[in-house]
Amino acid sequence: MVDLLTGLLPPFVWRLLIIVLQIVAIVLPLLIAVAYLTYAERKVIGAMQLRKGPNVVGPFGLLQPMADGLKLFVKETVLPTSANRVVFVGAPMLTFFLALVAWAVIPFDKGWVLADINVGVLYLFAISSLGVYGIIMAGWASNSKYAFLGGLRSAAQMVSYEVSIGFILISVLLTVGSLNLSDVVTAQSKMWFIVPHFPLFILFIISGLAETNRAPFDLPEAEAELVAGYNVEYSAMTFALFFLGEYANMLMMGAMTSILFLGGWMAPFGLGWLPIPGLIWFVLKICLVMFVFLWVRATFPRYRYDQLMRLGWKVFLPFSLFWLVLTASVLTAFGWLPNQG
């Protein structure tokens, strides 16, 4: 039977089909996770504000994400008369596409990675740097001063904190000696990097909040002053694509935190003997980081814009650079640099 099926189509078609199935196996659970992250956010923040959160649609409100998605799907997409239509529609598509393609190099378990490339960290850094273009395009194409100001704020914010994230990544990579994300995880078999690099872990979490435009760094969407920021003119599915892209980027930041500092798919506290797949541990760690993101949103007030810039350039950048020099010095002094000779 297998030989018959193989003979029906050329080998390259089968390879293409396998790749498509692998992509679907990543994208479909990711979209479901994004949908239920919105539900979890409303439940967690509701509990912190002594409310119930969504509890009407389905048991315990579990069908609320489906209702929200259906609502956005059936609404009309309104295009502003003075907008550049091609760029206006292309911006949310670009944001959503970049949020998805970043997951190609994420190792979910040992050997469970779509593209196991040797420069996985550089790939992720490049994709995250491109994300700002979608927001700038949206702000400019809307032909609205509120959207344009939101886009400019977002560009400045993301670029500012990407510099610190870059130095944090270099410090971790010096400890590993490889740009491959699977190697980063296996290097933590004896000790997770959260122990030697704990200050970097805190910096990475806070920089991740700023990079994904989450509270208390949600200046681009400052509804108190900019109505809704760069997406003020968007509605229906174009708005939904921005929404999905933002939450997919949040999950990506959780996955990166898990891989760089929390041992990726490895079991915590010496529980590796339990018959629990590495994928489950990886997902649980992402959920833990997401809870921190939601907790911060419910707890802290929004930063003023000058405070945000000062924190990025005058605190995070010098400290991450100092830690990079310290890491390199310690590794060199004790002969701990990996892959020597």
From Swiss-Prot:
Q: How does it assemble?
A: NDH-1 is composed of 14 different subunits. Subunits NuoA, H, J, K, L, M, N constitute the membrane sector of the complex.
The name under which this protein is listed is NADH-quinone oxidoreductase subunit H
The UniProt entry lists membrane topology as: Multi-pass membrane protein
Membrane-spanning ranges:
16-36, 86-106, 119-139, 165-185, 191-211, 254-274, 276-296, 315-335
The enzyme class is translocase
Reactions catalysed, semicolon-separated, are: a quinone + NADH + 5 H(+)(in) = a quinol + NAD(+) + 4 H(+)(out)
EC number(s) reported in the record: 7.1.1.-
What keywords would UniProt list here? Cell inner membrane, Cell membrane, Membrane, NAD, Quinone, Translocase, Transmembrane, Transmembrane helix, Ubiquinone
